[in-house]
């Protein structure tokens, strides 16, 4: 995190890793950080009332984590007060940019994992998050386990001769 920067620096957003103080919009990403014992790196969340993670609520009650309100209109002053290393959020189509946050100097990391069309593509994003938080080996190990299980079940399903296969629903709304 403190290593010297190359010169000249290319255009783009500089993110120094590992991230130690972040704002996280999604309970999916909070859960992943929980798996790696990195909940202490979450300084703020949006939509706390929708997060079904007792550990996140406990950290909020202890004053270790700030509720920033609705993810579509988060409390900008609280976000800036947190002084995060980065904001992890899900990009929305036609959102018109990030307003005040674009000018705040806080790096914005668009977590587009939910846009992946394959389960393994979506799962592989954990390697990216692992790099951000210094959990590369944990992320790689977790992904390898998921990949192995997925391929096993996929192979099993392809071998099924039954015309009456069960229907699977995901992403309940």
Write out the residue ranges for each language-model feature.
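A short, structured surface patch at a secondary-structure boundary
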Residues: 2-80, 86-93
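Extracytoplasmic substrate-binding proteins
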Residues: 21, 64, 77, 81-173
């Amino acid at each position: 995190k403190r290593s010297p920067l190359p010169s000249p620096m290319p255009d783009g957003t500089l993110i120094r890793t590992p991230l130690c103080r972040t704002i996280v919009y999604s309970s999916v990403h909070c859960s992943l950080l929980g798996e790696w014992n990195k909940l202490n790196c979450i300084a703020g969340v949006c939509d706390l009332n929708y997060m079904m993670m007792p550990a996140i609520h406990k950290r909020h009650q202890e004053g270790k984590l700030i509720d920033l309100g609705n993810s579509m209109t988060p409390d900008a002053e609280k976000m800036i007060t947190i002084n995060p290393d980065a904001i992890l959020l899900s990009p929305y189509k036609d959102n018109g940019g990030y307003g005040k946050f674009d000018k705040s100097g806080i790096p914005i990391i668009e977590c587009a994992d939910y846009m992946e069309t394959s389960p393994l593509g979506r799962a592989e994003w954990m390697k990216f998050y692992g790099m951000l938080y210094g959990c590369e080996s944990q992320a790689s190990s977790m992904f390898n386990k998921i990949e192995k299980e997925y391929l096993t079940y996929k192979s099993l399903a392809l071998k099924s001769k039954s015309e009456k296969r069960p229907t699977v629903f995901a992403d309940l709304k």
